Amino acid sequence: YGVCLDYAHAALSKVAPEEWAKRLGRYVKHVHINDNDLVSDLHLAWGDGKINRQVFYDSYDKYMSKASVLVETSSYENKRRSFEVLKKEGFI
């Protein structure tokens, strides 16, 4: 079995998102990413909010590297911009 870690939801919790990744990492089969303002679940393009992307990349590489990733944004344009950031930052 496994779990889906919604990283944007984790970023809104009282527990640091990298702690979620560390504790659940061996069970994480799938990850949802998008950005937010650390207050509300906005489904912004990756890079348009306040989530620390480098912490995500490091956590993914260390704890969840075999998990699939879904860019879960509110529009096609936000997905396109997210992929541009992910490519520019070397994640994909």
Describe these PLM feature segments.
Residues 1-5, 10-92:
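Histidine-acidic metal/acid-base catalytic patches
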